Amino acid sequence: QISSGRLKRSQWIERWGLDVARGMHAEVVEAFDVFRGLIRDHAIACEPQDGGHYYIAHRPWMMPTLTKEAALLRETFGYGARMLTRDELHATAVRDREAHGAMWEPDGTAVHAAKLAFGYLRVARELGAKVHVDSPVEGWTTKNGVHHLRTPGGTVRARAVAVATAGYAPRGLHPQLRDRIMPIMSNSIVTRPLTASELDACGFKVTSPLTD
């Protein structure tokens, strides 16, 4: 999904202005290109389902809102979002009986998350990075410009530290993490591969992301 948080592009403009919003949009578009390049150039077999993102309207009042947002994406950001009616959504993407329509965005990819993570691990090691598993950072102090990261196996010293923990780093680990990241519960259901008849019964016609 071509997004950078919960706010829509119109809300970006309201909060930070058009120039910043355009810069953020360009950054997200670039991130998709980088992602596609990484999995292509390094042969990361993460089963990408690259067919765009469907933002489904499950309430009638959402359709005018999404219609305005799609127009903004096209006219202000030069991005090819478009609207689908209920019938178009049913015919081309998913037979969702509660849907009133959807906004489709060209960028949206579903992946096998574990295969992607292990692919990144392989690539990092091939490029010379040292990866130490089972070594959580339990304490972080900074002295004279040097970071000291305490782990169960010893202390790592570094001039620079990149935090790549999503929203699940302890809030007290470092002052700059406090109130800047938010863990959000995500419930996932995994099934065996569905048969063609099961997919038809569920109404799925695409394997790309569907959200509301």
Model-derived features: positions:
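Short coil-to-beta-strand
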Residues: 1-10
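Hydrophobic side chains in beta-strands
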Residues: 2-3, 58, 105, 190-191
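Rossmann-like flavin
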Residues: 12-123
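Flavin-dependent oxidoreductases
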Residues: 139-212
